[in-house]
Amino acid sequence: VLNYDPANPSNWNADQDIKKSPLWPYCGNSVGIWKCPADRSTVRPSSGPFAGQVVPRVRSMAMSIWVGGWKQNNGLVTDAGCSGPTWRVYSKLSDMADPGPTRTWVLMDEREDRINYGNAFTDMIGYPDAPSQWRFHYDYPGSYHNRACGFSFADGHAEIKKWRDDRTCPPIVLGGAWNAVEYVPSPRNPDIFWMQERSTRKK
């Protein structure tokens, strides 16, 4: 998990998590692809070779929880607030019949003050026709690029999505997490709908 704890090597040591990932053999030995250059978050480790130094955190990317699921729960997404059992978790390309690989995002930039685990949770509650229920889970997309965020999709293409709603882009809280509330209501937010459309479908 990524945070600002100086005793947590996951913040600054790529050997801790990134290089243990099943995706690492496909990364060209490049740690840098896991962090957006616009994310300038840092941490001061309390131990190890960088103890006492200010060093950059290693990651700003997160993977859709609907692609691969939640490791700590045998791949299942069972959060009641996200109607977990109702929605598909894609474990291989052939699972992605709907919405299809070109419409299923896999990785995105996440905000430095909200990123935690390696997954990003798009809350599906209210999709598609109950917009008064739409909300963010703890995970928020990045907005570093002039209120836009980078997404990569299952077919290999990438998109920069320009956000339309101010609620998607609150000011960054430097050096810490803002608003520890797990769910943040954002009714009728078109940006949430855009992510829901490209996340999963009902079983």
Where do the language-model regions lie?
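Short, well-structured segments within or immediately adjacent to enzyme catalytic domains
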Residues: 1-203
